[in-house]
């Protein structure tokens, strides 16, 4: 399912650090994870859609960069986020 405004607001509410938080690494990673899971299912069905596959790889790289940044800055926040999102690592 595509990320609708209601879903996006709900995800931001679940991962925000303070009231006006929309850009913290936790929020960004959560939104990217949702988009990645959607694109993963799309690519499984449409195997020849290389354009979407490339977009998926770009998103995975962006999420990896944010997670690496968070791990360097605050390991406890990183571990908490990984556990909440159910990511491997």
Curated annotation (Swiss-Prot):
Keyword Ribosomal protein among UniProt keywords: yes
Database matches in CDD domains: Ribosomal_S15p_S13e
Any one of the GO CC terms: cytosolic small ribosomal subunit
Keyword check for 4Fe-4S: no
Record key words, sorted: Ribonucleoprotein, Ribosomal protein, RNA-binding, rRNA-binding
Pfam families: Ribosomal_S15
Domain of life from the UniProt record: Bacteria
GO molecular function: rRNA binding; structural constituent of ribosome
Alphabetical GO biological process terms: translation
Family that this chain belongs to: Belongs to the universal ribosomal protein uS15 family.
Biological role stated in the UniProt entry: One of the primary rRNA binding proteins, it binds directly to 16S rRNA where it helps nucleate assembly of the platform of the 30S subunit by binding and bridging several RNA helices of the 16S rRNA.
Annotated NCBIfam families: S15_bact
Subunit structure as annotated in this protein's UniProt entry: Part of the 30S ribosomal subunit. Forms a bridge to the 50S subunit in the 70S ribosome, contacting the 23S rRNA.
The protein's name in its UniProt record: Small ribosomal subunit protein uS15
């Amino acid at each position: 399912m595509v990320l609708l405004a209601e879903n996006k607001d709900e995800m931001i509410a679940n991962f925000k650090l303070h009231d006006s938080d929309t850009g913290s690494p936790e929020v960004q990673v959560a939104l990217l994870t949702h988009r990645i899971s959607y694109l993963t299912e799309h690519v499984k069905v449409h195997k020849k859609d290389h354009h979407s596959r490339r977009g998926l790889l770009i998103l995975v790289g962006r999420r990896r960069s944010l997670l690496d940044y968070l791990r360097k800055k605050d390991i406890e926040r990183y571990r908490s986020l990984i556990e909440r999102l159910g990511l491997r690592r």
